[in-house]
Every structure is written in C-alpha cells, then in structure tokens.
C-alpha cells in the first residue's frame, strides 16, 4: 500500500502546476506516509517546512553516518540528490515541486534501504550512483572507483535490468552493457 501511495504522491507532485488541489493531496499523502514511516516525534509537514528542508545545506550530515567522505570526493553526503532524468531535471531547484519530490525520495530511500527498491528510484530519477573504495577502517572514502550516471543526458546502460537467460537463449537481444 505504501508503494502505491508513493506512486500516487509522485503524480500529485508532478501535477502541482496544473491542478490547484494537487499540493494539498501530495502533502496529505506525504504526512500519512511519514507518520507510518517515522514513529518517534513525527510532526506534520507543511509546504514551507519541506521547502526549508530541501533548500538548507547540511555540512555535518555525513557525521550522522558511519562512513565519511574525503576531500577527494566530488560530493558530500546529503539528503538531496541531483535529478538528471526527464521530466524531473526541468524542475526549479528549491521550488515546491522539486522540494516535495526530494522529500518523497528521501523517505523512500529510508524505507527501502535493504529491499533493493532504491535501484528503481536511481534509474527513474537519474540519480548518480558512486562506487567508493574505502580505507582499512571502512569509514573514509579513499577514492571513487566508478559512477553510474545520466548526467550527460544519456541513460547509462548498466542501469537496465538484464533479460533472463532463457529469453536471451530464445533469440531476444540482451540489453546492452557498457
């Protein structure tokens, strides 16, 4: 049920410019979703609180995690991700739509942490995935060994799920790999 709500909520967010009631519907869903996801001390979110969260910078955000980024990392740990896939890449950064979408993506990232569902979000929104080499204590990033990105406007073929072996054996062309 929560997965269906996320899909519906994303649709409401993308229709905010066309439908004046979409904002209220999206906020209602986000609050219901968040109340079920975060039980301790949950406070109802408003459009203003979501925009404030999405436009603030979080210099100490990486301290919340075991791993830490290094000076050679192109990014610091941040709850917001750059969206490269259309139509999400055309949203005004820090605007109501982009802010609410970032909040929804953050909640989905939290909910689906160990379920493998994040891969579909990284593909859908064109979020860059970095692969890191960590030091001996597994806390500090030594270097980035690879990244899967749609930044240049072309979808990275490694994001596509490969077809099953029996389907390929039957003659269907497999999805390309890099």
Question: How should these model regions be labeled?
Answer:
Residues 1-4, 8-178:
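Acidic/polar-rich alpha-helix caps and helix-coil junctions
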